[in-house]
Regions:
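Internal alpha-helical scaffold of NAD(P)-dependent oxidoreductase catalytic cores
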Residues: 57, 63, 87-145
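Rossmann-fold NAD(P)-binding glycine/threonine-rich loop
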Residues: 28-34, 43-61, 68, 82, ...
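Extreme N-terminal starter segment of soluble prokaryotic enzymes
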Residues: 15-19
Length: 145
């Protein structure tokens, strides 16, 4: 599955509720008041791993994974910001298993990279660039809802 595409986009309907789970305040500011079909769940002071775990837990609760959590081929120990889109769309058992597998693999990959080389304390200018990169990765998915 391509990392930058919506998952199951052929099954989307206009009345779905989408949620961005993010630790990126730039995403919160940009999409926080986007409209009634899009919510932002902002995890302040959270890391990438926290975002992935929150998204996985939401999928266990019945949410649909709409974007690949490792989009952009950016290693988890390179960018401290992460945004994942989920929705309340219908999930069949095969999709559920696929979504959980994607999330568990992403969590394992994130843990592996962070254990090998923890995130450095980036200066604010670099953090700003990383926030922008993360936001740009989610823009194409948001533009399709």
């Amino acid at each position: 599955m391509p990392a930058d595409t919506l998952i199951g986009e052929e099954g989307r309907t206009l009345n779905k509720l989408y949620t961005l789970i993010t630790n990126n305040e730039l995403v919160k500011e940009r999409y926080g008041a986007y409209g009634k079909e899009l919510n932002v769940e902002y995890l302040e002071d959270a890391g990438c791993l926290d975002v992935l775990i929150k998204a996985r837990d939401a999928i266990h609760g019945g949410s649909r994974l709409e974007t690949h959590p490792m989009a952009g081929s950016i290693k988890p120990n390179q960018n401290p910001y992460k945004t994942v889109m989920i929705s309340d769309g219908k999930v069949d058992p095969e999709e559920f298993q696929e979504f959980i597998t994607v999330m568990e693999n992403s969590i394992m990959t994130c843990r592996k990279f962070l254990m090998e080389k923890p995130l450095p304390e980036w200066e604010e200018k670099l953090k700003k660039d990383f926030r922008y990169i993360d936001q740009s990765l989610i823009e194409s998915a948001v533009s399709r809802i």
